[in-house]
């Protein structure tokens, strides 16, 4: 009869300092299918090491171990995990149930790693628990089960994938006598159903219930009677077979890893929340700085645009402060007409100005009188509170009309509802008020002088007596590049004058400078926020490293029931990612709350959350989870199952 399990000259030694300590010495053993074997020996005799080798949790240092004719030394770690998953079922003295799972969920674990569909494995788990008398304890956590009930759950878990070979390590060691008898009765029933049952024990009463007792002492077998041939029932419990396609197996595996990660997080709510806190603060900081910073930038740029950022000012001379008499009369009315004919010009206005006294009744105030065209207010995007600007006829006739700014109106007419039609004196010339304009803020701050505007022809001929212009302001059409417009303007006037006796000031350069400055500031603040996110990620890594240490035995249990190293890596990596993703979602919610509160106190701010910002936040949190979760996950996947199971 061919042996199911066969050890030939197997030895196992472990390093101890510079020496090797032999635990098993030249073991040769055959165990046939359907046997019930007891391995006995005193503590330290090597029986647990022998069981670990039989269960493919450990490999011999020398010698050969075959399972159903397959030499396990030729198998890689994934193949060994598959062998454990499909052929072996473990029953431990301390049950080794996962405390955050129910009885049914504990039983399902081997089938999860076998890739069995959820409905099939749930039905299988309930069937096994029903057979073992636990139908009313299916949804109970281990803490609500007695020792005997927990061991029966452990037996059901061992049978989940078929359990051709049952390895029971001191299965009654932690039970009272009655519960111990029940467990042994179940093991005998499994033997009768065709399972191979191997019991490791030091209790002679337990060993006596086996058909064959193998005694081990100081790493050597000292008693090994031959196997007894008996006719038994045929048909070991059939495992639930996975017939799903490869992509569906992968999707199912990922979904189950996600579910297990969520359960593990829920089992330690406070620790999970504290772990998330760093990510929440980091993501909230990044998102808040991006969206609030963008809102602040747009507000600043809007204020700058309101001053007329698509305007170009033309002044006589070489630069500001140049009072050379030969350049003073450089700009003429004909230059204005030529500029207005250019296709890229929206509007243009001349400007001549002088400080004068403005009088109405007994009120006498100083004002800055500006001679402009009717397009001036369009060039600077100014609106009217009352009345309107002067028209072409009034400009041509040098009409004695004036537009006041809001501050001037308030000084002259504090109690009048409508001032259009009132007559005031500008210098010594009477003029009629035809409008009140809302003045836009200046790039250089608001002057303390009050402003009034008259037709430039009126200002030049009637008040100043000059034929030249102090400056010309050009508004460029929307969509036209301001720099190119400035170059064309310079060429036009240079050709007209025969020389460059003027200079230009492009307000678009102010906008570009402001954009660059705000971008630099926002980038700096974002980098500061990213540092907080990195600190949060390091916190996740620290907690996950602690979690791996705390859950070492859990990792050993999962490997014993068939989890591959990649399964463990995937689970812990998903846990880290899930912590960061949930933390990222909470961080985004916090940033939205911050934005809402800011809008309550700063109603002028328009804070919006773009899909790009939200997607970037989730990508950041996912990347953080992968980056800082990989090291703990790798450490978990590299654990030796024997060492992991031995940890307290």
Swiss-Prot record:
- Would I find Transport among this entry's keywords? yes
Q: What is its EC number?
A: 7.6.2.-
Q: Which UniProt keywords apply?
A: Antibiotic resistance, ATP-binding, Cell inner membrane, Cell membrane, Membrane, Nucleotide-binding, Translocase, Transmembrane, Transmembrane helix, Transport
User: GO molecular-function annotation terms?
Assistant: ATP binding; ATP hydrolysis activity; transmembrane transporter activity
| Record-listed ATP binding positions | 41-48
- EC supergroup of this enzyme: translocase
Q: Which residues cross the membrane?
A: 273-293, 417-437, 523-543, 578-598, 611-631
Identify the SMART domains for this entry: AAA
Q: Which InterPro entries match?
A: AAA+_ATPase, ABC3_permease_C, ABC_transporter-like_ATP-bd, ABC_transporter-like_CS, MacB-like_ATP-bd, MacB_PCD, Macrolide_Exporter_MacB, P-loop_NTPase
What subcellular compartments does it reside in? Cell inner membrane
Would the keyword Translocase turn up in this protein's UniProt record?
A: yes
What positions does the domain ABC transporter occupy?
5-243
Biological process terms in GO annotation: response to antibiotic
SUPFAM superfamilies named among the record's database cross-references: P-loop containing nucleoside triphosphate hydrolases (SSF52540)
Give the record's GO CC terms.
Answer: plasma membrane
The record gives the membrane topology as: Multi-pass membrane protein
The text of the family note is:
Belongs to the ABC transporter superfamily. Macrolide exporter (TC 3.A.1.122) family.
Q: What does this protein do?
A: Part of the tripartite efflux system MacAB-TolC. MacB is a non-canonical ABC transporter that contains transmembrane domains (TMD), which form a pore in the inner membrane, and an ATP-binding domain (NBD), which is responsible for energy generation. Confers resistance against macrolides.
Question: What is annotated about its quaternary structure and interactions?
Answer: Homodimer. Part of the tripartite efflux system MacAB-TolC, which is composed of an inner membrane transporter, MacB, a periplasmic membrane fusion protein, MacA, and an outer membrane component, TolC. The complex forms a large protein conduit and can translocate molecules across both the inner and outer membranes. Interacts with MacA.
Which PANTHER family does this UniProt record tie to the protein? MACROLIDE EXPORT ATP-BINDING_PERMEASE PROTEIN MACB, MEMBRANE COMPONENT OF TRANSPORTER-RELATED
Provide the protein name.
Macrolide export ATP-binding/permease protein MacB
Q: Which organism is it from?
A: Salmonella paratyphi A (strain ATCC 9150 / SARB42)
């Amino acid at each position: 009869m061919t042996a199911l399990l066969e050890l030939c000259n197997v030895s196992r030694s472990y390093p101890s300092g510079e020496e090797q300590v032999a635990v098993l010495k030249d073991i040769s053993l055959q165990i046939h299918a359907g046997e019930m074997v007891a391995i006995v020996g005193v503590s330290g005799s090597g029986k647990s090491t022998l069981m670990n080798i039989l269960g493919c949790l450990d490999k011999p240092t020398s010698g050969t171990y075959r399972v159903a004719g397959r030499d396990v030394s030729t198998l890689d770690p994934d193949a060994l995990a598959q062998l454990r998953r499909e052929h072996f079922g473990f029953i431990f003295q301390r049950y080794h149930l996962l405390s955050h799972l129910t009885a049914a969920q504990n039983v399902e674990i081997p089938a999860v790693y076998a890739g069995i569909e959820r409905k099939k494995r749930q039905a299988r788990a309930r069937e096994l628990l029903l057979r073992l008398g636990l139908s009313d304890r299916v949804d109970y956590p281990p803490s609500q089960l007695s020792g005997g009930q927990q061991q029966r759950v452990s037996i059901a878990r061992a049978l989940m994938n078929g359990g051709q070979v049952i390895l029971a390590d001191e299965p009654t060691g932690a039970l009272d006598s009655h519960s111990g008898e029940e467990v042994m009765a179940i093991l005998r029933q499994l033997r009768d159903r065709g399972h191979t049952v191997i019991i490791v024990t030091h209790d002679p009463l337990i060993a006596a219930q086996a058909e064959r007792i193998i005694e081990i002492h100081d790493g050597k077998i000292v008693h090994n009677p031959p196997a007894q041939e008996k006719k038994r029932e045929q048909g070991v419990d059939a495992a639930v077979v996975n017939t799903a396609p490869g992509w569906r197996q992968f999707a199912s595996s990922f979904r189950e890893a996600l579910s297990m990660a969520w359960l593990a997080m829920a089992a330690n709510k406070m620790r999970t929340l504290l772990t998330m806190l760093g990510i929440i603060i980091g993501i909230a900081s990044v998102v808040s700085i991006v969206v609030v910073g963008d809102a602040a930038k747009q507000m600043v740029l809007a204020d700058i645009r309101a001053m007329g950022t698509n305007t170009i000012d033309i002044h006589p001379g070489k630069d500001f402060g140049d009072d050379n008499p030969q350049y003073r009369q450089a700009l003429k009315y004909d230059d204005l007409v030529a500029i207005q004919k250019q296709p890229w010009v929206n509007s243009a206005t001349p400007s001549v100005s002088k400080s004068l006294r403005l009088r109405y009744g007994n009120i006498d105030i100083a004002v800055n009188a500006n001679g402009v065209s009717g397009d001036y207010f369009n060039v600077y995007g100014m609106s009217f509170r009352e009345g309107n600007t002067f028209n072409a006829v009034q400009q041509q006739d040098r009409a004695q009309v004036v537009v006041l700014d809001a501050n001037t109106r308030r000084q002259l007419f504090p109690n009048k509802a409508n001032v259009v039609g009132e007559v005031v004196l500008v210098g010594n010339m009477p003029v009629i008020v035809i409008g009140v304009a809302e003045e836009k803020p200046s790039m250089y701050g608001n002057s303390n002088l009050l402003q009034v505007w008259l037709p430039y022809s009126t200002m030049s001929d009637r008040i100043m007596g000059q034929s030249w212009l102090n400056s010309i302001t050009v508004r460029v059409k929307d969509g036209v590049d301001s720099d190119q417009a400035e170059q064309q303007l310079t060429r036009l006037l240079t050709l007209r004058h025969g020389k460059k006796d003027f200079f230009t000031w492009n307000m678009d350069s102010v906008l570009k400078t402001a954009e660059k400055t705000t971008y630099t500031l926002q980038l700096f603040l974002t980098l500061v926020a990213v540092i907080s996110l990195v600190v949060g990620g390091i916190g996740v890594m620290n907690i996950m490293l602690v979690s791996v240490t705390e859950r070492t035995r859990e990792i050993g249990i999962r490997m014993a029931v068939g989890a591959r190293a990649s399964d463990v890596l995937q689970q812990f990596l998903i846990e880290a990612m899930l912590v960061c993703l949930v933390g990222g979602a909470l961080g985004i919610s916090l940033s939205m709350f911050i934005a809402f509160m800011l809008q309550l106190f700063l109603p002028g701010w328009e804070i919006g959350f773009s899909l790009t910002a939200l997607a970037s936040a989730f990508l950041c949190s996912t990347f953080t989870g992968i980056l800082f979760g990989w090291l703990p996950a790798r450490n978990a996947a590299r654990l030796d199952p024997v060492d992991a199971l031995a940890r307290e």
